């Protein structure tokens, strides 16, 4: 198994490979820093299972916990710090979040980095005010408006409320989150390169996200509410923002010429880069994005045949400071019997060999046998 270089054209596979069907091995931090060097991630279970969870430590949680067991970000959203009590995850949640379209601000800045930074800070301040307005709307609601969360005592301290009470004193434990998308495309619009291509651009990009975190921290102190910065996942928003900006500004090479903006602070998936460098570039943002973050890498091959390589990637993520990491591996698909998983020269389900001709009768037999 070798590492995948992003942007390279993948060689043809022996069996039909579905790009949409990928197993994700999501690895959450679960060990204190003191034992990081002794961490050994065992992945032998991959042989029997298509999915396996593993745990490792990074520095993003240890300020709040004597970490023991698996700590979940709930797939990007992270609720930890609390200005109104203990920094726990139970009985709390994210109240709302708003995402800033960084590429649009960069296009409007016409290559001026100073103007762009001012725009980012100004829009971020607007987002804080918007989140405050949302909070006020939610805070004036009554317990009976939330029969499950409040009426059943799911939300922290809600068991002390009566049916007609406002929920303000309860939802203040929640988070109000500012997010961002398209850092890579924003840098291309400003400098002609993104943060995966140039160290100076990477330094500026980091300062941009750092300024967003400062806006959140300042708002937390000023309003005594839990404002946080999230590396927005934006699976749907990434395409919507791009379509809107292409309609307004036209096709801009490296910015609006694709069907999507790159999620948050990620290096573009189409850019050729080693997994190690990708981790190094994205890791510093995890500490800034205290409202949630994730980084992906992809391995091209059967991880069950080389668990040491898989383990090396996980350890590298841990040492780099990745707070939430995912390792994707391609999944093969046999169109005859419908088997999904790792396929070598022979399908483990029906025994069909690579390139073997199959009669129509045999196909019908296999599909009937496996209920396809």
Predicted segment positions?
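Short secondary-structure subsegments characteristic of cysteine-rich extracellular domains
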Residues: 62-74, 196-216
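Conserved structured core elements
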Residues: 37-40, 52, 94, 114-117, ...
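Structured mid-domain segments that build the active-site/substrate or prosthetic-cofactor binding neighborhood
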Residues: 75-181, 185-189, 194, 301, ...
């Amino acid at each position: 198994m070798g590492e995948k270089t992003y942007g390279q054209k993948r060689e043809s596979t022996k069996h039909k490979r579905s790009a949409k069907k990928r197993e994700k091995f999501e690895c959450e931090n679960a060990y204190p820093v003191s034992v990081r060097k002794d961490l050994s991630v065992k992945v032998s279970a991959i042989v029997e299972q298509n999915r396996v969870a593993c745990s490792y430590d990074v520095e993003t949680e240890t300020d709040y916990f004597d970490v023991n067991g698996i700590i979940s970000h709930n797939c990007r959203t992270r609720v930890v710090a609390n200005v109104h009590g203990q920094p726990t995850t139970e009985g709390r949640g994210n109240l709302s979040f708003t995402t800033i379209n960084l590429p649009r601000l960069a296009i409007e800045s016409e290559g001026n980095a100073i103007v762009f930074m001012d725009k980012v800070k100004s829009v971020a301040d607007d987002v804080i005010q918007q989140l405050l307005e949302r909070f006020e709307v939610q805070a004036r609601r009554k317990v009976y408006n939330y029969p499950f969360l409040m009426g059943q005592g799911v939300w922290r301290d809600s068991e002390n409320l009566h049916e007609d009470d406002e929920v303000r004193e309860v939802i203040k434990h929640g988070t109000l989150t500012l997010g961002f998308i398209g850092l890579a495309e924003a840098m291309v619009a400003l400098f002609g390169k993104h943060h995966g291509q140039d160290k100076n651009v990477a330094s500026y990009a980091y300062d941009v996200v750092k300024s967003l975190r400062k806006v959140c921290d300042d708002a937390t102190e000023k309003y005594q509410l839990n404002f946080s910065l999230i590396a927005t996942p934006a699976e749907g928003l990434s395409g919507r923002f791009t379509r809107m900006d292409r309609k307004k500004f036209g096709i801009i090479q490296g910015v609006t010429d694709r069907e999507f903006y790159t999620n948050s602070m990620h290096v573009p998936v189409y850019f050729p880069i080693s997994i190690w460098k990708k981790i190094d570039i994205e890791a510093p943002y995890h500490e800034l994005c205290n409202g949630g973050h994730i980084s992906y890498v992809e391995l091209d091959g059967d991880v069950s045949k080389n668990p040491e390589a898989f383990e090396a990637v996980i350890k590298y993520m841990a040492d780099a400071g990745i707070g939430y990491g995912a390792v994707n591996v391609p999944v093969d698909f046999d169109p005859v019997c419908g088997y999904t998983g790792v396929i070598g020269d022979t399908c483990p389900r029906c025994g069909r060999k690579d390139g073997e001709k199959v009669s129509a009768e045999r196909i019908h037999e296999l599909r009937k046998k496996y209920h396809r």
